């Protein structure tokens, strides 16, 4: 008997256990069947028992001899009596899920798990996993012709199958090589991978009778945490970085024995969903890594089912193989904590928001989780960060969403900080998490929960009975970007769709959900390390956040429909006034920066400061300022950042020099003002420094800002960015203001995410059924190990990029970049020379300040008269020259006669 049940009597028709618990795997039905309405045979009419016990007391069959019945049907099972293919029947009324799937308790076993194994217990291949009326499934074996170059000779088996609830669903055995590395039962979630070919829209997934493995156990598993990792074409390093953090969090929760929710079997309450955006876009090395974990298998996916196109390929497997990164190579680590994996490989590339629709509307509706965690591939959560996010919801029942601290990845020893762009972004991220996020969390409304690392309460996101609500507004962005009727405002707004989701969640009708910032939860992500990458990233961020902020301000009255208290609504009102002021400053950022520059550089020309040197420097920098700002506009309106990288880099250097000059001007002017006070004939008092208007305006205001940054960082016990990144941030501030803002606003017409592309991909086989049954070819059992070894070898070595010859489209793009570059140079030369001519003639643009003559008005009048004379007499001379030519033509014509 099962030792966990003591001396309790065995239920009817259950064979005595030889000292090991029966492990029949998961039972394929959605209902727990707790009401005992199925008579003496238990729920066998709707619920199947699986043979997994030897009546003679032998140990379970070793995993490497399990038979593969991948195409076995479990459809149309009603009406069956007692199972005829097994030696016992299990009554779910007396046993719960923990009985059928034992808690993870690794114990040492020899290679191959053949302790006590007897050869005569081998199960023939045609014996089904589940009892079925026609258990001997006919099959036809054939072999592909030998591949050239010594490739693996692939064997396939044509198997008969029946649809499961009208859908194509296979249970496929995982490779024996993988089984030998991990503990497992006779036939359970560790030995078989489940494949489903979804032929519907994600909104219809549940209505089309698709389900997931967690709902198929005799006692369906409750999903407390549902984690999604969205990816596009990230390589295996980025993917492994994220999955390593997720696995560590699951291990952390399983090692909390005193928790009411978590503990040894915590992994059963957590499902990790990986959604890849397009079969043609997934990185082959990442796909091979998933195969190495047992989550993916090549050769079983189908293109069409009964002439219906497959929209997503869904693979389910409980893996005990974790990952680690050593020397920039991903390695598999076996015999670790089990993790329930769900891999959704979308057939077409449809953007990240569509991936979230599969997560929330398709899989979420089936699993009905409590908390949903959103991650981007490449973001590595801290070892206990996901737990701390969950804890925020557990402690605050009205917490509808939460986010942690996003950190910039700095590399070993912070070596990435040597790149000024990385250091500046590190400072940005830190100050946002020290000042912005805590402020918004105190009010209860965070303007944006970053999609790279955030969490939501699933019930809080649900729409009302009329289909209106947070998710409805959130997924509206998918149709807006795909349709021609979308306005430019809405399209840009939904570039920051996570901001819309936050707003709609807090303003949800008749609810009072709040958003929180969890500082103890951290997520590390890589940041752009080149100017071109930064420009492209911030284009979407700036445009999306700006238009989403306008949306929130315009729809501020939507807070009145919520059920928040008057005090909370008043707090929201104060926060929105604050956000409006910030948006106004962001709108006038370029103008404000130029005015500060002009005032400081002009002041340096005073005789008490730099005098004539200051005037000349001011004019030179003003001209350069105008030239580079015009260059920003010209590049933004027509050039690709990738094709103008050198120009953007040059602009970064120029704006850094401008910032150095401004900082020098502020300090120099203040010091001179203090010296003047010290040398005052009326005496000097320390209080006179603070009464000095120049010192008060420049130094006190600046030091107040920087002092607040430093004090807040010290209070948060996170001050190191002030030492390592402050200088780089200050030098790149003009670049953020001028270059990034100009490019963003000049490209408001571009509402793409930069990931939509060609979906041409290798065609998969199709299947057709008649009366719910059909035939298909699947990888043969003998080829599983060879296929597994081939997949593992893909990522076993460091990736070496092979430079291939550029494609015709790439060559054409390079040619267009060259043409755009020439056009940019011509336009800039044309604009600058014309502007220079006007400035010289009119003595404007600072030229009047460097004149040495005392009567500047007379000089300007004289210069204007000379200019007018030159222009007018030049026009007259040109006309006269034309007249002479015309007269000569008439003379020649008169003598020629024609």
Curated annotation (Swiss-Prot):
InterPro entries linked to this entry: Chitin_synth, Chitin_synth_fun, Chitin_synth_N
Record EC number: 2.4.1.16
Induction line: Exhibits lower expression levels in hyphae than in germinating conidia. Expression is increased in the absence of chitin synthase CHS2.
Top-level EC class: transferase
Region (Disordered): 1-154
Transmembrane segments: 441-461, 540-560, 570-590, 616-636, 651-671, 697-717, 726-746, 825-845, 870-890
Assigned keywords, A-Z: Cell membrane, Cell wall biogenesis/degradation, Glycoprotein, Glycosyltransferase, Membrane, Transferase, Transmembrane, Transmembrane helix, Virulence
One function term, GO molecular function aspect: chitin synthase activity
Primary site of residence: membrane
Keyword Membrane attributed: yes
Domain of life the protein comes from: Eukaryota
One Pfam family per UniProt: Chitin_synth_1
Cell compartments where the protein resides: Cell membrane
Keyword Glycoprotein: yes
Glycosylation sites: 685
Compositionally biased region (Pro residues): 9-21
Catalytic activity: [(1->4)-N-acetyl-beta-D-glucosaminyl](n) + UDP-N-acetyl-alpha-D-glucosamine = [(1->4)-N-acetyl-beta-D-glucosaminyl](n+1) + UDP + H(+)
Topological relation to the membrane, as annotated: Multi-pass membrane protein
Polar residues: compositionally biased ranges: 64-75, 136-146
GO cellular component, one term: plasma membrane
CDD domains the UniProt entry points to: Chitin_synth_C (cd04190)
Alphabetical GO biological process terms: cell wall organization; chitin biosynthetic process
Sequence similarity: Belongs to the chitin synthase family. Class I subfamily.
Function: Polymerizes chitin, a structural polymer of the cell wall and septum, by transferring the sugar moiety of UDP-GlcNAc to the non-reducing end of the growing chitin polymer. Shows additive effects in septum formation with CHS2, CHS3A, CHS4, CHS5, CHS6 and CHS7. Regulates mycelial growth and conidiation. Involved in virulence and mediates mycotoxin deoxinivalenol (DON) biosynthesis via the regulation of the expression of TRI4, TRI5 and TRI6.
Protein name: Chitin synthase 1
Organism: Gibberella zeae (strain ATCC MYA-4620 / CBS 123657 / FGSC 9075 / NRRL 31084 / PH-1) (Wheat head blight fungus)
């Amino acid at each position: 008997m099962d030792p966990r049940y003591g001396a309790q009597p065995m239920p009817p028709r259950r064979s005595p256990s030889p000292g090991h618990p029966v492990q029949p795997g998961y039972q394929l039905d959605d209902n727990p069947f707790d009401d005992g309405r199925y008579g003496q045979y238990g729920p066998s009419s709707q619920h199947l028992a699986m043979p997994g016990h030897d009546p003679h007391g032998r140990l379970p069959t070793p995993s490497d001899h399990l038979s593969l019945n991948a195409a076995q049907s479990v459809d149309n099972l009603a009406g069956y009596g007692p199972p005829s293919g097994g030696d016992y029947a299990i009554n779910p009324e007396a046993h719960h899920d923990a009985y059928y799937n034992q808690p993870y308790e690794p114990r040492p076993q020899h290679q191959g798990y053949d302790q006590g194994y007897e050869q005569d217990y081998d199960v023939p291949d045609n014996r089904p996993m589940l009892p079925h009326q026609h258990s001997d499934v006919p099959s036809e074996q054939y072999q592909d012709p030998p591949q050239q170059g010594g490739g693996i000779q692939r064997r396939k088996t044509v198997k008969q199958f029946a649809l499961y609830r009208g859908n194509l669903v296979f249970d496929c055995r995982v490779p024996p090589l993988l089984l030998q590395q991990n503990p497992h039962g006779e036939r359970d979630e560790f030995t078989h991978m489940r494949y489903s070919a979804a032929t519907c829209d994600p909104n219809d997934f549940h209505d089309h009778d698709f389900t997931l493995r967690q709902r198929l156990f005799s006692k369906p598993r409750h999903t407390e945490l549902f984690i999604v990792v969205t990816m596009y074409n990230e390589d295996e390093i980025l993917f492994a970085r994220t999955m390593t953090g997720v696995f560590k969090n699951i291990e952390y929760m399983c090692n909390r024995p005193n928790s009411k929710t978590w503990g040894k079997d915590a992994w059963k309450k957590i499902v990790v969903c990986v959604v890849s955006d397009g079969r043609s876009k997934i990185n082959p090395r990442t796909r091979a890594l998933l195969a190495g974990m047992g989550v993916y298998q090549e050769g079983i996916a189908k293109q069409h089912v009964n002439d219906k196109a497959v929209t997503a390929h869904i693979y389910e497997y409980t893996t005990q193989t974790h990952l680690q990164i050593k020397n920039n190579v991903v390695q598999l680590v076996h015999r670790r904590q089990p993790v329930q994996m769900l891999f959704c490989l979308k057939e077409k590339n449809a953007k990240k928001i569509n991936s979230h629709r599969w997560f929330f509307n398709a899989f979420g509706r089936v699993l009905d989780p409590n908390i949903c965690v959103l991650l981007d591939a490449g973001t590595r959560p801290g070892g206990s960060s996901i737990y701390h996010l969950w804890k925020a919801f557990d402690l605050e029942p009205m917490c509808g969403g939460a986010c942690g601290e996003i950190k910039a990845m700095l590399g070993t020893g912070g070596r990435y900080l040597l790149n000024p762009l990385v250091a500046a972004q590190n400072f940005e991220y830190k100050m946002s998490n020290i000042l912005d996020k805590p402020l918004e969390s105190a009010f209860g409304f965070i303007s944006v929960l970053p999609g790279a690392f955030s969490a939501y309460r699933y019930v809080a996101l649900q729409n009302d009975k009329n289909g209106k609500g947070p998710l409805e507004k959130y997924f509206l962005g998918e149709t807006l970007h795909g349709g021609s009727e979308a306005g430019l405002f809405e399209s840009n707004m939904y570039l920051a769709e996570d901001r819309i989701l936050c707003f709609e969640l807090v303003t949800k009708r008749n609810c009072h959900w709040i958003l929180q910032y969890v500082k103890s939860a951290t997520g590390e992500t890589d940041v752009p390390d080149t100017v071109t990458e930064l420009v492209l990233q911030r284009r979407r961020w700036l445009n999306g956040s700006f238009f989403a902020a306008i949306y929130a301000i315009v729809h501020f009255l939507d807070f009145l429909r919520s059920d928040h208290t008057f005090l909370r609504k008043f707090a929201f009102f104060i926060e929105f006034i604050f956000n409006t002021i910030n948006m106004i400053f962001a709108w006038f950022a370029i103008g404000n920066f130029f005015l500060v520059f002009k005032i400081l550089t002009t002041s340096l020309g005073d005789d008490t400061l730099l005098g004539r040197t200051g005037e000349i420097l001011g004019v030179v920098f003003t001209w350069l300022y105008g030239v580079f700002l015009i260059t920003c506009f010209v590049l933004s309106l027509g050039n690709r950042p990738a094709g103008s990288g050198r120009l953007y880099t040059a602009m970064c250097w120029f704006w850094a020099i401008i910032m150095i000059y401004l900082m020098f001007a502020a300090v120099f002017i203040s010091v001179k003002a203090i010296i003047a006070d010290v040398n005052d004939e009326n005496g000097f008092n320390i209080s006179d420094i603070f009464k000095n208007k120049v010192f008060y305006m420049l130094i006190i205001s600046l030091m107040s800002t920087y002092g607040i940054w430093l004090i807040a960082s010290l209070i948060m016990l996170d001050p190191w960015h002030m030492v390592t990144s402050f200088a780089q941030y200050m030098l790149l501030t003009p670049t953020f203001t001028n270059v990034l803002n100009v490019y963003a606003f000049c490209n408001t017409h571009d509402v793409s995410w930069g990931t939509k592309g060609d979906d041409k991909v290798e065609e998969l086989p199709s299947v057709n059924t008649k009366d719910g049954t059909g035939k298909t070819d699947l990888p043969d059992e003998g080829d599983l190990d060879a296929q597994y070894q081939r997949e593992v070898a893909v990522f076993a070595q460091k990736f070496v990029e092979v430079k291939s010859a550029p494609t015709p489209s790439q060559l054409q793009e390079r040619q267009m970049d060259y043409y755009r570059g020439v056009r940019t140079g011509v336009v800039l030369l044309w604009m600058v020379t014309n502007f220079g001519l006007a400035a010289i003639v009119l003595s404007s643009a600072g030229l009047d300040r460097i004149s040495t003559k005392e009567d500047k008005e007379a000089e300007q009048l004289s210069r204007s008269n000379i200019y007018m004379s030159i222009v007018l007499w030049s026009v007259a001379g040109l006309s006269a020259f034309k007249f002479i030519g015309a007269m000569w033509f008439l003379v020649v014509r008169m003598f020629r006669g024609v």
